[in-house]
Amino acid sequence: MEGDYSEKYVDYINLSRLSWKRPEGPKRVWRVVDGRKKMPSGEVPRFIIQEVPESMEEELVDFMTKYFTAEETITVSQKLLSDPIAMKEIRTLWKETLRQGVSLVAIRENFESDKKSEIVGVNVLFVCTNEDEDKLTSAIEVRTRKMKTVMGTQFRLAAEVDMAKMYGVDRYLGAFGLSVNPSYRGQGVADALLQARTDIGQAYQIPATETIFTGTASQIVAARNGFEVLVERKYTEILDDEGNVAFPGVEPKFMKVMGKKLLKVNVRV
């Protein structure tokens, strides 16, 4: 087991120090939603949006590796897939984030009980409190140049947003990636995953959410689901540690930090 782990992960990224802990209890199903169009088989699919079972964690990390890393704006720009150590780092980031237990998986509802559940979408989520703000950057101790650029630029942009002042909250829901299987795009899966954050907020008293959306499509979906732009930066103005444009040649014009209130009553800080 240790050998297999070392082939896929690193041992220097650890998010166990984050202060928020999910209340004990079984994994929760947040929503069951119908797709928007027929599949080639002629049926309109139905999706279950739920918390990630431990038995599915490895498959979920593999899903993000396959789809997110290969398509996401800044990981593609940095050619993350070409760096085996950087890939171990981002896989470890996802694996560690799953510890908190609030990440979401979209599963296609299957009426044939003998078939394995099919993952169609994932949103890797975490809860960050005011006291965790500094812990987060130190806990995500990436060492490869590519991941330092990917994470460092996002941390610097996110640091321009003070969630305590912006929304009057002492904790919020953050994210480290959302991805949908290409075969199910256009079915509303990304919308359902973002909408489920409201369910999480209400159930666990998390009053707001903040996420960096790097691509045009995800920014549109976020805006459609009530997210507002808190800060944005042109990609041509985002520099790496050496002062060079961090993500040259990307198609989107802006990287955006977007947020949304999840509860009507704010938590006092």
Predicted regions and their residues:
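C-terminal helix/juxtamembrane-tail motif
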Residues: 194, 198, 244-269
